[in-house]
Each structure stands twice: as C-alpha cells, then as structure tokens.
Amino acid sequence: MDHLEVYHQFEVSKPVSLQPHLNLLAKGLIGAEWLVAGSGLGATNHFEAGGFMRSRAGVEWPDVQIHFLPVALSYDGTTVAETRTGHSLQMHVGYNRSPSRGFVRASAPLPPVTSNGAGDLMTAPPPPPPVVRFNYMSDEEDWRGFRAAVRIAREIVAQPAFDGLIGPEVTPGAAAHTDAELDQFLVEHLESAYHPCGTCRMGAARDKMAVVDGGGRVHGVDGLRVVDASVFPTIPNGNLNAPTIMLAEKMADHILGRALPPDHAQAAATWIDPEWRTRQRERPPVRKQWDGEF
C-alpha cells in the first residue's frame, strides 16, 4: 500500500552540497538561472545517483532502494542537519519488499509478510471520511530488511570512492550498530515515501480482493474504469511514477482498442544473478563495516 524510507545523513567534507543554497536569496538566483537559461542547480531533481540491491542471499529480485540527495534535511525542507562544514548529504534508504506476493522469491520460503494495510468505506448518510490503516512495520521481516538496508548504505559510503568526501555520520550516528539501536533509530525516523497504491487492485473476477479487471474495468459496474496507481495488485519495489505511466499507456491502448505490435509481445530480458540463492553479491566490498549477518 505504501513505501517507507529513512534518511541516512552524513556531514560532507567538501563544498559540494546544496546546504549553503537554502536561503531565500540563493533560491531566487537558482530559479532565475533556470528560467532564463535552463541551467544550474534548478535544472536537476537532485536525485541523480541511486541503486537497487538485494538485502541478502536467497532474495531473487532487489528489495532495497537507495538514492542520494546532496543535502541532509527533512522531507518538508524545514529542518536541515547541523554540520561543522556547512555541507551535508543524505541517502534515502528504503526496504521495498512487496508484501505477501510478487517481486521477491526465495530458495527457502520467506516468512509471510503481514504488514498489510486496510481501508474502510462506510455508506451510512452522511458518509464519514474513509479510514486508512497502513499497519507499517507490523512484521519482523520489515525490521530485518530495514536494518540490512541501513548497513548496506554504510558499506557504500565506506568505499574508497568516498574518501575525502564523507565526514561523520549524523543519523543514525556512529554509535548505533546493534539491532536494538538501529530499531530505535527506525522507530524515531521512518516516514512515508508518499507512494500509496494498490487500494483498487487488479485481478480476476473470482478474486474477492480485486476491484478491476486487466483492462481497468470495475467488476460489476458498466462503463467505469480506474487507471491509476491504485490498481497495482502488488507494490512495485521502486518509485511509482514510471510504473504508473506504463500502466496508463497500456490502459489507453485497451480503451482505444489498439493491439500491441508483435515485437512487443515479450517482456524485456532482465538479468538475475545465477547464484542468487547462495550469495548476496559477486564480491566482498573493499571495506566492510559490518561483520554480522544482514
């Protein structure tokens, strides 16, 4: 129903972050350059580096997403990390395993994920507001996955490519290493990535939880379709914008009666580590920050 994420923040040793440009004058200059020339800091969305990875051996598809932002601040921009250098960065770290079905398979069955949300719609007049219960982090697998994601993020910034750039860790802080310490950090800092979806899921008419069919038509209702992220039957293990655009284009073809050409009949090939059942990576990192199991 939604993705959670946590901000892993660091001080930066070189003047390469956005932190000095957050005042009103700097924002105005950035905006003016973009309006006039289409260049400068205003011409980027600033999430230009990121990646998907598997949290452990036995997971076939990536279940961890990390992307970098060149300043450490809260989602609404009101709180900026205090650093000695005046520069910072943060990694947006998410464990994006789709609950109960879909994108992750393992050689041995994973424990069932029970962090499934629910919503209530009442019809009594006047209808009260809908009730949505996201039920975040109600399964131990979610805690394990987020701990692994934070430790992987630490491994990334510990590599030689970041030498001379990354300073002290701001959050969760160098002292947070045990499961209990990381869990406390997660309790205090996890927040929504604002990726709600799946409340109007696609499926066969015999599926009691399905609302629409493969063409977006609402079961049992004539002349009504739903074409948005709510019809995803499972949560994609990444951001929703690209899948939603793909869904809308496909549904538009259905509505217009267009048939896909033959060369689109098969999905693009994807690479999967042939040894995914027994290893999490091809080789160990140059510097390893964690000696235990992810």
Regions found by a protein language model. Give the residues of each.
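Mid-to-C-terminal "cap/lid" subdomains and adjacent gly/pro-rich loops that border
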Residues: M1-R84, E155-A161, A180, Q184-C197, ...
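Structured core elements
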Residues: Y7-Q9, F52, R105, D120, ...
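Glycine-rich, aromatic-lined ligand/substrate-binding cores of catalytic
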Residues: A43-V132, Y136-P160
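Intrinsically disordered, low-complexity regions
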Residues: L29, S39-A43, G51-F52, T78, ...
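C-terminal lid/capping helical subdomain adjacent to the catalytic/cofactor pocket in oxidative enzymes
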Residues: S100, L110-S115, P125-F294
